[in-house]
A protein has these predicted regions:
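ATP/NTP-dependent adenylation/nucleotidyl-transfer catalytic domains that generate, transfer
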Residues: 7, 23, 160-164, 221, ...
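Enzyme catalytic cores with a strong preference for nitrogen-chemistry domains
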Residues: 1-350, 366-376
């Protein structure tokens, strides 16, 4: 449970219809196995103690008495276990019968949540036996000295982890226009458990899965769905034990249907709370809910859920291609509008032969195509300097010609040498002045060409560079419209790859593939034996690590310790722990110290959920202290 991870289980025992004593044994055994597997929240199906398909046997006093006795035995069984259990049973109160979920912890019955919506259509006729749950909280007497609250407005709150609040709904409740989980969530519940007995018909599993995913997304919550399965009566229908665990729209685990399979995963409570803090329209309510405390030990939770090392990049090729097509269109449409608004006659781009300028050129070409403008109005400028290699130069020239842009070449060597002479910079001293002088000279050239041609300078820098401040202030940092400003480096590669795969031009494809194969470099230092000597990832670290850090820090608000923990899992076998920690420290240090560059970024389109525009997603003071983050990093090993 440390760092917000809570292991949950959805469990379907093979019950015997109406045999409460046998079911008690089966349920206790499943609870034991789930708890030994580390589950802290264990959810069993609707009416699991008796079986959902008892039908008119629910009206038998003997059945109800035995069900209550079974509940007390199961509750006692939890005394030595570190978990909270939710199990279904029929419960009589004031002469009425209710279909309820019982919450059990530390040997006690914490409370009962009755089902709100009773299906009474098609194969369902629950209203024949049960009464709709009451709004007010009442007290149910279970034994001479034992009582427990019952009502729809109950939430179960962990006293050792107050961030964890659990709400309950039962089967049909999920399928209605206004599920109880909505009010639960608005009153603080961030985990919803659903005790279900959903029969199987053709195609129903697809709809059910979308309901669970959609509910968890809409309510920014974890959702644990446990359904009845083999063991229920098949007199008229079949139950498939379709169990699911979802978190904010993502399916974390799902059982094979017809297998009575227990499933496990970890729900990230702190992530859900961070999402709710961010979404200010998720307005909390006060509907008179009663919160009931339970206790769990705070222990390290072994993570079994998949940790994606590339959070910005979809895993499947089909999804990746759709994402790339969409992003290219967003970028192009953003630029199209800016060109129309400013009545610019041309676009000016510095082309280095690297990934970022390549993507910016491709986006500009797409925008011009949308506008019906001639590619010759794209002034693609290559500006060889002291670090330019033949490979990047040749790729830049070939690419420009393949795309039909107006090729321009302006060497910066003479101008930079004159500038160095004017300011007293020794050209043999390859320091920050040596590097930044070249970057600023290139920006000056582009700005002047734009003025001369009535054009607009298109920025090429990407999100990853901006996060690290890997840009020369008022050099490549500056433009008139920055099309790549919210595209992370790991995604830039896939966008260029997608364009290469779909352009239909063999020569252009070959050039783009070689650009992809070229080391990332600003080429501001002289080459060695004609090859790139200055490799960005050797200096600031691998971009795949930095993009991982950026996503989890900025998008989810995770602490350094939590990011480090997840990165070790995500990049196991690729980077050792020391390397991950080294570059994580670099990331935090640079992220804070370089905010002044992000505070004056030019306009550019947002394409994803993470961006650093000072007018949009990141409003951060340039002089904020990084002390508390760096101290946490220093304590990590």
């Amino acid at each position: 449970m440390r760092q917000g991870f809570v292991k949950v289980a959805a469990v379907t025992p093979k019950i015997v219809v109406a045999d409460t004593r046998e079911n008690t044994k089966l349920i206790c055994e499943e609870i034991r196995k789930a708890e030994e597997s580390g589950a802290k929240i264990i959810v069993l199906p609707e009416l699991a103690i008796t079986g959902y398909t008892c039908s008119d046997l629910f009206l038998q006093e003997k059945m109800l008495r035995e069900a209550k006795q079974s509940l007390l035995e199961i509750a006692a069984f939890t005394f030595a276990l570190d978990c909270i259990v939710f199990v279904g049973l029929p419960l009589e109160y004031n002469g009425k019968l209710y279909n309820v979920a019982a919450a059990l912890n530390n040997g006690k019955v914490l409370g009962f949540v009755p089902k709100t919506y009773l299906p009474n259509y098609n194969e369902f006729y629950e209203a024949r036996h049960f009464t709709r749950g009451m709004d007010e909280v009442v007290i149910v007497r279970l034994d001479k000295d034992l009582t427990a609250p019952m009502g729809k407005k109950l939430l179960f709150v962990c006293d050792t982890m107050p961030e964890l609040k659990i709400g309950v709904e039962l089967c049909e409740d999920l399928w209605t226009p206004e599920p109880p989980a909505i009010r639960h969530a608005l009153n603080g519940a961030n985990v919803i458990v659903n005790l279900s007995a959903s029969d199987e018909t053709t195609g129903k599993d697809i709809y059910r899965r979308e309901l669970v995913k959609g509910q968890s997304a809409r309510l920014l919550c974890g959702y644990v769905y446990a359904s009845a399965g083999d063991g229920e009566s098949t007199q008229d229908v079949v139950y498939s034990a379709h169990n699911m665990i979802a978190e904010n729209g993502r399916l974390l685990a799902q059982s094979e249907r017809f297998q009575n399979e227990s499933i496990f995963s970890e729900i990230d409570i702190l992530k859900l709370n961070a999402e709710r803090r961010r979404m200010t329209t998720f307005e909390m309510a006060e509907d008179g809910y009663r919160e009931i405390s339970f206790s769990l030990k705070i222990e390290e939770t072994k993570l079994t859920r998949y940790i994606d090392p590339m959070p910005f990049v979809p895993g499947s090729k089909a999804d990746r291609d759709r994402r790339c097509e969409e992003i290219l269109m967003i970028q192009a449409m953003g630029l199209k509008k800016r060109l129309e608004h400013t009545h610019c006659k041309s676009a000016v781009i510095g082309i280095s032969g690297g990934l970022d300028s390549t993507l910016a050129l491709l986006v500009t070409v797409k925008a011009f195509d949308i506008l019906g403008m001639d590619h010759k109005n794209i002034k693609a400028v290559t500006m060889p300097g002291f670090g330019t290699t033949d490979r990047t130069y040749d790729n830049a020239v070939s690419m420009i010609r393949c795309l039909g842009a107006d090729f321009m070449e302006v060497s910066i060597k003479d101008a930079v040498n004159i500038h160095f002479r004017d300011i007293g910079q020794d050209p043999k001293v390859h320091d920050v002045t040596y590097e930044n002088g070249q970057a600023r000279e290139r920006t000056q050239i582009l700005m002047d060409i734009a003025n001369k041609s009535g054009g607009m300078v298109i920025g090429t820098g990407d999100l990853s560079e901006l996060a690290l401040g890997w840009a020369t202030y008022n050099g490549d940092h500056m433009s008139m419209y920055a099309v790549n400003a919210s595209v992370p480096k790991t995604l830039v590669r896939h966008l260029v790859q997608f364009y290469a795969d779909t352009c239909g031009d063999g020569k252009l494809e070959k050039v783009l593939l070689d650009v992809l194969d070229t080391p990332v470099s600003p080429e501001l230092l002289p080459p060695e034996d004609g090859k790139i000597a200055q490799k960005t990832e050797d200096l600031v670290g691998p971009y795949e690590l930095h993009d991982f850090y950026l996503y989890h820090m900025l998008r989810l608000g995770y602490s350094p310790a939590k990011i480090y923990r997840l990165a070790k899992i995500a990049f196991a076998g690729s980077y050792d722990d020391a390397t991950i920690l080294k570059w994580l420290k670099t990331f935090y240090r640079r992220f804070f110290t370089q905010q002044f560059k992000r505070s004056c970024l030019p306009d550019g389109p947002k394409v994803g959920s993470v961006a650093v525009s000072p007018r949009g997603d990141l409003r951060m003071p340039s002089d904020a202290s990084s002390r508390i983050w760096m101290e946490e990093l220093e304590n990590l090993q």
